Amino acid sequence: MLSEEDIKARFIPFDSLRYTTEAFIDYCIPECSPKYNYALIGPGVSQNPKQPVSLREKHGFQVGGISMPHGKTNPAHMHFTAEVFICFKGDWQMQWGFNPGVHTADVGEGDVLTVPPWIYRGFKNIGVDDGFMFTGLGRDSTGGILWGPSTLEAASAQGVHLTEDYQIVDERAGQKWDDSQKALAPMTPEEIAALRVWSPAQMSQRIVRFAELDWSGDALLDASLPGCGAQVAPVLGLGMSEARDHQAPVTNSHGFSIEWIRLPAGGRVSRHRLQEKQVLITYRGKVQIRVETDNVDPDSLPGNTVTLQATGSPQGWDSYAMPADCWRSLHNAGDTEALVLLMTAGDARKHITWAADVIRAAGVCDKAMDANGYVGAKHFIDRAQP
């Protein structure tokens, strides 16, 4: 059972976010600073022990945010788990390789790029000064971040060093750096050359353009019910779509899945629950998120409900960390379409448990779940062999 305070504490309004400009060693490099680093779910890979974190609870993945002025660059670095960039505002040039050549691809609002582990990557703001990307990192323990040799050299030239135990030593702030300290050894050119090379054509398969999303109006059991009408578009991994022909453009393991959900004005997603933890980021519109405190069975009436309103606009995007296995529903509280990004823990397919009254109402509309957990015509499903 959840308390009202527990439920409310998981709401992350955009205006509550706090950043640091000194999360990483590149803060001292002029072309890389300022860079505003946010940690929403988990600490991410920040090398600053004072990094503000909105919610430290483990989810199986981590959610962060990044913003920096036009023309600023995040230099070459590498991760050991998935890193997903979700562009919510502006235009960005994504870079990868540094092996030694650099490949680039531009992304815009609503686009998602997932960069494979064990390759160097960076990015540059080529749009508005307040451009913003959310980020998803695979796993609770990511293994940290490994900077490219050129990044460590540029920082050292500014008097800022990274020790082999990942402590930042800033001589400009009066900290001492001497021969007794051991600097982090970067990869050698030979080691970098041994990393996999991803061509622009290969990386393009890992960019999911917002304009090319595969929306389905049959992805949820309740979609055809009066006052519902939600559509779902998969991005990566096995999500909660109940459309049997849905397949995400990116299918390899990340530790989480990503989908978009679109609610028409006045629409909703009816009462349901998932076994997995899920993070919702409101991209556009006003969405009421209703969460129940009691973990009752599907036949029970709704229990005590906490209602939160999440808003998404070019000025900011509210988030909510949905607890596992709790009853919830989503309602479009605005007079325009609402868009929400869903990040759900786990590589396995997610299975929705619908409230009993939703299942009955769907049956009246000749909709039911087949033996494989997909939406189909009830009059056929009822004829299936026991």
Where are these regions (language model features)?
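A short, N-terminal "cap"/entry segment at the start of jelly-roll beta-barrel domains
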Residues: 1-59, 163-254, 374-386
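Conserved short histidine dyad/triad with adjacent acidic residue
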Residues: 44-51, 62-79, 257-275, 293-296, ...
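Short histidine-centered beta-strand/loop micro-motifs
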Residues: 51-56, 74-79, 96, 104-105, ...
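Glycine- and acidic-residue-biased ligand/ion/polar-headgroup-sensing regions
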Residues: 70, 80-98, 265, 275-297
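Histidine-centered metal-chelating micro-motifs
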Residues: 73-75, 93, 100, 112-113, ...
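Short acidic-glycine-tyrosine-enriched beta hairpin
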Residues: 98-116, 293-324
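Double-stranded beta-helix
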Residues: 122-196, 327-386
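Long compositionally biased, domain-poor regions of proteins
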Residues: 263, 269, 281-284, 288-311, ...
